Regions:
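Alpha-helical nucleic-acid-binding subdomain
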Residues: 104, 109, 229-495, 501-512, ...
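Non-catalytic, well-ordered alpha-helical scaffold segments
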Residues: 19, 81-84, 185, 196, ...
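Phosphate/oxyanion-binding active-site loops and adjacent basic polyanion-contact surfaces
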Residues: 183, 187, 217-221, 297, ...
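Conserved helicase motor core of SF1/SF2 NTP-dependent helicases
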Residues: 234, 239, 248-292, 459-466, ...
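P-loop NTPase Walker
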Residues: 1-4, 9-36, 143, 162, ...
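A structural signal for short, well-ordered beta-strand segments and their strand-loop junctions
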Residues: 86-88, 149, 409-410, 447, ...
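Amphipathic, well-packed alpha-helical segments that form the structural scaffold of globular domains
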Residues: 192, 196, 200-203, 226, ...
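Extended, charged low-complexity regulatory segments
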Residues: 1-188, 192-197
Length: 704
């Protein structure tokens, strides 16, 4: 039988099984909908029952509705590409189909094995050297319910039964050539053994994943999160998983990966949105971001918080019987220092501040009594403290002198250069103080990403104010939905992507979300844009606390870039990295990257021309990458090219992204924007999977 006929026959054979799977899926969905309807009926019936029975029925309703909703969400999320693989075992002759979730028929016979189950591990781990009893491994490519193609690997040729067909070019190489879309796809069908070892590593402690561009670090980390939730749902599912990425562009890019695997109990945050209620995208100039990210800022913020607010009264004057008691500025400063010296956040220390003020006033009254030849007895002192403590004028002063502090307010105070200099002391240089105060004063673009870690630090320093308990009953949660408490920021597992770029202050911010969590940390030192890697490494170690279990995996195969493109990127970072820190590209396309000399005067036309060429050539996305301060200009140049496949991004926002083709605008601009400019350039050069055009006005950007 010819190859095309064999392929068609094998596709038809798999289609028959896929049809059975989707028929069963429809049955399971119908059952879940019936359970959902029954749950809501229980809720209506509970209104007619006694209180005890009512509570029991409402609990039963919530559990039934919750589980029905979860089942429906899972079934709907896994609909596309539900089955993607098959294992044929040599010893038993059994065929195991692998997919996004496990499905059994009405007789409990296995139709699909969940990719995270131990029985599916051989799909990713079996090799010709260690076949794990797998004679044939098949990747099944589907669109909806239709089988489009199959690709086979024979792992035990000597055990291949007569009549067992083998077709295809190899699933991985086929996937590498496929066009990219706006969002990252999951890689459950093409996970390689070195990646699978990381995904299935134990949950405890800290798992570090290092590797160069295109090694699949991000995809592996996300699949690891899905695997851990599947295998340890009771342990990790309660508080959920937090995934922290470098930018909103990146988190949007990866946003569909985990839902496509049925995992919804995952929070995706960029560094600018880790703090609830904030959404920062603005990037500070590198020199400013370096100061804001330094751990030195903790001392600066602590001193700023402990200083008197700018509008606090400078003097306390209060009448007590026939005497006028005064606390002058120096005395008030001593009182403030005394309160802070006893520890505790200021928003929970107002009572202590009031007590210390009253004692200071009593000291003044005692001095007045001695000056007049008398004394203030202990009983009279207690009486003074009680009476003044009940006076409305004292409490008016207290509210102004020791107000409830808000992080944004304190950060705003530091726009005053003199106030910032006082808070900084010797922690910052005069130049750094000027840079920071100017940055804090300019709020035209809102908070910067680096500001968010400072706000979070202040949030912890000032503390939550004490609140009176409300008699109001909290609203009843919506049936079927798991409610996360407001401002609850603890997670069971934390994934940090592009970890090499986190500043020490950002590490402190993320660490607060995972004091009792296990961690998956993804990064590549060669791509780091943080100027002091040792400083950041120390902060990361502090974030992990006393966790003694730390395991490191290094991914060495670059599946994204062609060998031709990566060779150029490696030249750009020569001298910045050791050879063993660079990955190895596994495929050649015969297409060399184009480096086009241009002038600044013709740059706009050249960018439009290059983008148009690539849109005509590739079937997927085209990225246009420039220095951060040039993004808006480049965006205007391309405004007339209405193509949703075209994306303009800045050098720092390009981290973690990939495109079928890339236009890199003036590489020297990326080098000049920070002290780690060559590493940033390396990142930009490794975003393309197929074609790369570099437009360079400065010819000295590439080392000879």
């Amino acid at each position: 039988m010819s190859e095309p006929r064999i392929r068609r026959a094998e596709i038809a054979r798999e289609q028959a099984h896929i049809d059975r799977v989707y028929t069963r899926l429809a049955e399971l969905r119908s059952q879940a909908q019936k359970m959902l309807a029954k749950g809501y009926q229980l809720g209506h019936g509970a209104q007619r029952e006694a209180v005890f029975e009512q509570a029991s029925m409402l609990f039963e309703r919530d559990m039934m509705v919750y589980h029905a909703n979860q089942t429906l969400q899972t079934l709907d999320a896994e609909y596309e590409g539900l089955v993607f693989g098959r294992l044929d075992h040599a010893a038993s002759g059994e065929a195991v189909h692998v997919g996004r979730l496990g499905i059994r028929d009405a007789d409990f016979d296995n139709l699909v094995t969940d990719w995270r189950a131990p029985a599916a591990a051989a799909f990713y781990q079996a090799t010709a050297e260690e076949p794990m009893d797998v004679v044939r491994r098949r990747v099944i490519r589907c669109s909806g319910q239709q089988v489009l193609d199959v690709d086979d690997d024979v792992l035990m040729p000597e055990s291949l039964p007569d009549g067992m067909a083998v077709v295809g070019e190899g699933a991985l190489m086929a996937a590498l050539g496929r066009a990219r879309g706006e969002h990252m796809r999951d890689i459950v069908a093409t996970i390689q053994k070195e990646q699978d070892d990381v995904i299935r590593a134990p949950w405890q402690g800290v798992t570090e994943i290092t590797g160069g561009p295109g090694t699949g670090k991000t995809a592996v980390a996300l699949h690891r999160a899905a695997y851990l939730l599947y295998r340890h749902r009771k342990r990790l599912g309660g508080a959920g998983v937090l995934v922290v990425g470098p930018s909103p562009v990146f988190t949007n890019y990866i946003s569909r990966v985990l839902p496509s695997m049925g995992e919804t109990n995952v929070e995706l945050r960029s560094l600018g949105t880790v703090l609830d209620g904030t959404a920062a995208e603005h990037i500070d100039p590198a020199v400013v971001a370096a100061v804001k990210g330094s751990v030195r800022m903790r001392k600066v913020l602590l001193r700023a918080m402990r200083a008197a607010p700018p509008d606090a009264p400078a003097q306390l004057r209060i009448r007590y019987r026939d005497d006028v008691l005064r606390l002058e500025p120096a005395q008030l400063d001593r009182v403030r220092r005394r309160v802070h010296a006893r520890g505790g956040p200021p928003n929970r220390s107002r009572v202590r501040a009031a007590e210390t003020l009253l004692e200071a006033l009593a000291d003044v009254a005692e001095k007045h009594a001695r000056d007049d030849g008398g004394e203030l007895t202990p009983a009279a002192r207690r009486e003074l403290v009680i009476e003044l403590g009940e006076r409305i004028d004292f409490h008016r002063f207290l509210v102004l002198w020791w107000p409830e502090l808000h992080p944004a307010e304190i950060l705003g105070w530091l726009a005053d250069e003199r106030r910032l200099a006082k808070a900084a002391g010797s922690a910052l240089t005069a130049e750094e103080i000027t840079l920071l105060s100017t940055s804090f004063a300019d709020r035209s673009a809102g908070y910067s990403v680096a500001d968010i870690a400072l706000l979070d630090e202040l949030r912890v320093l000032v503390g939550k104010p004490k609140r009176r308990r409300s008699a109001a009953r909290p609203p009843e949660p919506e049936a079927g939905r798991r409610q996360r408490p407001e401002h609850y920021d603890e997670y069971s597992h934390i994934v940090v992507d592009e970890a090499q770029d986190l500043s020490p202050m950002q590490w402190r911010m993320v660490a607060r979300r995972g004091r009792y969590a296990s961690w998956t940390v993804v990064g590549d030192p060669v791509q780091s844009s943080w100027p002091d890697p040792a400083d950041a490494e120390s902060a990361a170690a502090a974030a992990f606390g006393g966790r003694t279990t730390r395991r490191r995996f290094t991914l060495r195969t670059n599946y994204r870039n062609s060998a031709e493109i990566f060779a150029l990127a490696a030249r750009a970072v020569a001298g910045q990295a050791e050879q063993d820190q660079l990955p190895v590209a596994v495929r050649r396309t015969g297409l060399e990257p184009q480096v086009r000399p241009v002038s600044q005067d013709t740059m706009a036309d050249e960018v439009r021309m290059a983008a148009g060429e690539l849109l005509d050539t590739v079937g997927g996305t085209v990225g246009v990458i420039s220095a951060m301060d040039r993004v808006a200009t480049v965006d205007k140049w391309l405004a007339t090219m209405a193509d949703e496949r075209l994306h303009v991004v800045g050098s720092l926002d390009a981290k973690g992204l990939e495109y079928d083709a890339v236009v890199l605008v003036e590489p020297q601009g990326l080098i000049d924007e920070s002290v780690t400019g060559r590493r940033v350039l390396y990142v930009a050069l490794t975003r393309a999977t197929q074609q790369l055009i570099v437009l360079a006005a400065d010819p000295l950007w590439l080392p000879s």
